[in-house]
Curated annotation (Swiss-Prot):
Keywords assigned by UniProt, alphabetized: ATP synthesis, ATP-binding, Cell inner membrane, Cell membrane, CF(1), Hydrogen ion transport, Ion transport, Membrane, Nucleotide-binding, Translocase, Transport
InterPro entries per the UniProt record, alphabetical: ATP_synth_asu-like_sf (IPR023366), ATP_synth_asu_C (IPR000793), ATP_synth_asu_C_sf (IPR038376), ATP_synth_F1_a_nt-bd_dom (IPR033732), ATP_synth_F1_asu (IPR005294), ATPase_a/bsu_AS (IPR020003), ATPase_F1/V1/A1_a/bsu_N (IPR004100), ATPase_F1/V1/A1_a/bsu_N_sf (IPR036121)
Reactions performed catalytically: ATP + H2O + 4 H(+)(in) = ADP + phosphate + 5 H(+)(out)
Organism: Herminiimonas arsenicoxydans
Assembly and oligomerization: F-type ATPases have 2 components, CF(1) - the catalytic core - and CF(0) - the membrane proton channel. CF(1) has five subunits: alpha(3), beta(3), gamma(1), delta(1), epsilon(1). CF(0) has three main subunits: a(1), b(2) and c(9-12). The alpha and beta chains form an alternating ring which encloses part of the gamma chain. CF(1) is attached to CF(0) by a central stalk formed by the gamma and epsilon chains, while a peripheral stalk is formed by the delta and b chains.
Binding residue positions for ATP: G169, D170, R171, Q172, T173, G174, K175, T176
Sites marked Required for activity: S373
Protein name listed in UniProt: ATP synthase subunit alpha
Gene name in the database record: atpA
């Protein structure tokens, strides 16, 4: 068989002409080593800091260490199937999570994937988990209240929309209970809540979700859970994911409340990741940028002005300010607030609520230490009626604590000191509150008005809460219009004071 040279050249020409010109450029590398959720990769010359990397088996990672001839990355999720020699691809994107109103009522993991068995989330938008906080010009001062429904907080350490208020205390002092009550109290207030559970037991998260469902709070709440069984990388990323979900509402002129429970565990997870990446350790073996870890997160909680919202939404939303209020939680060891992470977060936030083991064990719950708990910006945001009625309470409590310590050594006390001690004991008793029972502004005003006018002074201490409960029931049944007026106007007029005083006196006769 003879081949004609012209036929060969025609065949080659046709092959060349039919050749597809599409070429795919891909930046990829090879796994050198993998252990403890940390992966070293050779190659990836164009990778970005914080870029999402794609591993085999639809697993993603985060590039954190960019070195001369290798990249250190954390794997987000299971890593048992990844082995040496596997191919890793760059995605060209920073880590993103789904955002939007579709997430309300759902429980998701740190990557925004649903873990509640209710099917896909179907969110239309995604956002990077890291975002630069609004600048000075974009912000507005905090002047709207964020009612928690807890008497001790709303009266003495008020929280405003856009504030960062730290909840700090030892384990088992009721930190989560305070935050959950604050979420339950947002029902009907047009506030979207995000609860970020970091490093908690899955059973604890399940109980919290059940409590929120029982009180009708899940319909406006998103739960982001990175439980203790998940990798350190997922625990450290979860707070930023929750924040990105909250910013969606803030930037569209709505109000949101985010609870980080807790940032101590997030710092420990970040320390674990940093040490495995061989970053140099500093104080308490934390890396040098652990302050920045929390500051860049908490600075994103802010009240933004109408111009910012209008510019962000390209004119769709006009004349509305947005806010993201943060309640970070820190767990201390034996009341040591001077440890590294607690002092960092205290210096970043706009105030703190101290919860004490001794108060909790003596039955004062919520166990708030009024003397050292402060709100640096909330005073300007406090509801007028509560502000007017709560002025004397903080002073009474501070003097009571001082006198109570002194009275232990004194055998005979004069009448005025005895009166102050008796009053302080009743105020302390009144500020006790059951869990999952946040109060409305009007009922809180009734309680504070009654204690200010001395209606509790001649009652036995153990009967104070029973009197308050009965009084609330009496006011709801006989003076509902007055309660509604206080709720609507957020004020207590002189005429209303007289009506309220008469109503309390009337109830007291029958008590």
């Amino acid at each position: 068989m003879q081949l004609n040279p012209s036929e060969i050249s025609e065949l080659i020409k046709s092959r060349i002409q039919g050749l597809g010109e599409s070429a795919e450029i891909r930046n990829q590398g090879t796994v050198i080593s993998v252990s403890d959720g940390i992966c070293r990769i050779h190659g990836l010359s164009d990778v970005m800091q914080g870029e999402m990397l794609e591993f085999p088996g639809n697993t993603f990672g985060l590039a954190l260490n960019l070195e001369r001839d290798s990249v250190g990355a954390v794997i987000l999720g299971e890593y048992e199937h990844i082995s040496e020699g596997d191919t890793v691809k760059c995605t060209g994107r920073i880590l993103e999570v789904p955002i939007g109103p579709e997430l309300r009522g759902r429980v998701v993991n740190a990557l925004g994937q649903p873990i509640d068995g209710k099917g896909p989330v179907n969110a239309k938008l995604t956002a990077p988990i890291e975002k630069i906080a609004p600048g000075v010009i974009a912000r507005q001062s905090v002047d709207q209240p964020m009612q928690t429904g807890i008497k001790a907080i709303d009266a003495m350490v008020p929280i405003g929309r856009g504030q960062r208020e730290l909840i700090i205390g030892d384990r088992q002092t009721g930190k989560t209970a305070v935050a959950i009550d604050a979420i339950i109290n947002q029902k009907g207030q047009n506030v979207t809540c995000i609860y970020v559970a970091i490093g908690q037991k899955a059973s604890s998260v399940k109980n919290i979700v059940r409590s929120l469902e029982q009180h009708g709070a899940m319909e406006y709440t998103i739960v982001v859970a990175a439980t203790a069984s998940e990798s350190a990388a997922m625990q450290f990323v979860s707070a930023y994911s929750g924040c990105a979900m909250g910013e969606y509402f803030r930037d569209r002129g709505e109000d949101a409340l985010i609870v980080y429970d807790d940032l101590s565990k997030q710092a420990v997870a970040y320390r674990q990741v940093s040490l495995l990446l061989r970053r140099p350790p500093g104080r308490e073996a934390f890396p040098g940028d652990v302050f920045y870890l929390h500051s860049r997160l908490l600075e994103r909680a802010a009240r933004v002005n109408a111009d910012y919202v209008e510019a962000f939404t390209k004119g769709e939303v006009k004349g509305k300010t947005g806010s993201l209020t943060a309640l970070p939680i820190i767990e201390t060891q034996a009341g040591d607030v001077s440890a590294f992470v607690p002092t960092n977060v205290i210096s970043i936030t706009d105030g703190q609520i101290f919860l004490e083991t001794s108060l909790f064990n003596s039955g004062i719950r919520p166990a708030i230490n009024a003397g050292i708990s402060v709100s640096r910006v909330g005073g300007a945001a406090q509801t007028k009626v509560i502000k007017g009625l709560s002025g004397g309470i903080r002073t009474d409590l501070a003097q009571y604590r001082e006198l109570a310590a002194f009275a232990q050594f004194a055998s005979d006390l004069d009448a005025s000191t005895r009166k102050q001690l008796d009053r302080g004991a009743r105020v302390t008793e009144l500020l006790k509150q059951a869990q999952y029972a946040p109060l409305s502004i009007s009922l809180m005003a009734v309680s504070l008005f009654a204690v200010n006018k001395g209606y509790f002074d001649d009652l036995e201490v153990k009967r104070v809460l029973a009197f308050e409960s009965g009084l609330h029931g009496f006011m709801k049944s006989s003076h509902a219009a007055l309660l509604q007026k206080i709720e609507d106007t957020k004020k207590l007029e002189k005429d209303d004071e007289a009506v309220l005083a008469a109503a309390i006196a009337d109830f007291k006769k029958s008590f």
